[in-house]
Curated annotation (Swiss-Prot):
Residues annotated to bind (6S)-5,6,7,8-tetrahydrofolate: 121, 125-127, 355-357
Functional summary from the UniProt entry: Catalyzes the reversible interconversion of serine and glycine with tetrahydrofolate (THF) serving as the one-carbon carrier. This reaction serves as the major source of one-carbon groups required for the biosynthesis of purines, thymidylate, methionine, and other important biomolecules. Also exhibits THF-independent aldolase activity toward beta-hydroxyamino acids, producing glycine and aldehydes, via a retro-aldol mechanism.
Gene3D superfamilies: Aspartate Aminotransferase, domain 1, Type I PLP-dependent aspartate aminotransferase-like (Major domain)
Pathway noted in the entry: One-carbon metabolism; tetrahydrofolate interconversion; Amino-acid biosynthesis; glycine biosynthesis; glycine from L-serine: step 1/1
Protein name (Swiss-Prot/TrEMBL): Serine hydroxymethyltransferase
SUPFAM superfamilies: PLP-dependent transferases
Top-level class of the enzyme under EC nomenclature: transferase
Record site: Plays an important role in substrate specificity: 228
GO cellular component terms attached to this protein's record: cytosol
Annotated organism of origin: Shewanella sp. (strain ANA-3)
Assembly and interaction partners: Homodimer.
Lineage of producing organism: Bacteria, Pseudomonadati, Pseudomonadota, Gammaproteobacteria, Alteromonadales
InterPro entries assigned to the protein according to its UniProt record, in alphabetical order: PyrdxlP-dep_Trfase (IPR015424), PyrdxlP-dep_Trfase_major (IPR015421), PyrdxlP-dep_Trfase_small (IPR015422), Ser_HO-MeTrfase (IPR001085), Ser_HO-MeTrfase-like (IPR049943), Ser_HO-MeTrfase_PLP_BS (IPR019798), SHMT-like_dom (IPR039429)
Catalytic reactions of this protein: (6R)-5,10-methylene-5,6,7,8-tetrahydrofolate + glycine + H2O = (6S)-5,6,7,8-tetrahydrofolate + L-serine
Amino acid sequence: MLKKDMNIADYDPELFNAIQNETLRQEEHIELIASENYTSPRVMQAQGSQLTNKYAEGYPGKRYYGGCEYVDVVETLAIERAKQLFGATYANVQPHSGSQANSAVYMALLKPGDTVLGMNLAHGGHLTHGSPVNFSGRLYNIIPYGIDESGKIDYDEMERLAVEHKPKMMIGGFSAYSGIVDWARMREIADKIGAYLFVDMAHVAGLIAAGVYPNPVPHAHVVTSTTHKTLAGPRGGIILSAADDEELYKKLNSAVFPGGQGGPLMHVIAGKAVAFKEALEPEFKAYQQQVVKNAKAMVEVFLERGYKIVSGGTDNHLMLVDLIGRDLTGKEADAALGSANITVNKNSVPNDPRSPFVTSGVRIGTPAITRRGFKEAEAKELTGWICDILDDAHNPAVIERVKGQVLALCARFPVYG
């Protein structure tokens, strides 16, 4: 018999302690992983609701099970809000993740062996854009494009490769690129060779929703995103389009269900609906503007302290610190900063001589620190501490000093105040 007062603390203290420790870690550590963020209590409330009990294979109004009248309302709210947020005429909110959304696009538009032009992972792309260890690199013929000497996307090279190899699909989007992407130029190239343009905007979706980064939806045939990262929603994915092509929309829906997934996670879709509503509020735009201001402030300090930033700056929420030529690997930098309660991730940089498990760079992003209230002053102060550690990464005294400063700053800016 189920009772409302059942709880994890009494029943499963081992699990409860792990959850409590993670909660404390998030409060006492500064989160700089560019793909991480803090979702709102409203989103978590939706995810912890009775919607988790309901199977709902199919789409609103076309379910395979009965009893779906209320989950239809939930999913329709999420769909309509996503369309409003990004100016789309089609939205699928069922993908469990960004990678599964991307997989559905491949399935809908391509056949195994088709040629795809995607951004090189070592130049800032994503695993699902053609990495040989991913389904995309195993099932399709991938032609990688990259960045030039200045760290910017080389559109002339992209066009040359497109004309030479005639891919059926071109992919825009990134996981570690700090510049503005010219979606219109990419569509011109795609149209020149008769290819689909597919954009994965996962990293910058929140910035796009707020109007502080160019929107790819008017230019691409299909756009995907995660719903966490800069969007600050639950972990999941979405597929969008403004192509006004009903046949394309049917293919995309079929590729998600039944092509790649079974029942949707209705409690997560409810969380997405909440997050989309939050992203439509005026304060969300102010938040995203501050995300970019904080990133630019951090870059300023890194450059002043003599550190190289790939592309020389940032126009979004992230930056890639290039440690090539320094007696410090990305892995060592990651570990040293982690010991001071600063969480980053090691990351390959262009022309990296080290393996992806070691790397010569670290990726840093500002969505999470901005979410807890940091502004430029705190971002600059924090970057100074990071540089202190990178300058002397094997000095325990420096790490302990910075850790104390981090704890004091975290206490001033609680995640959930």
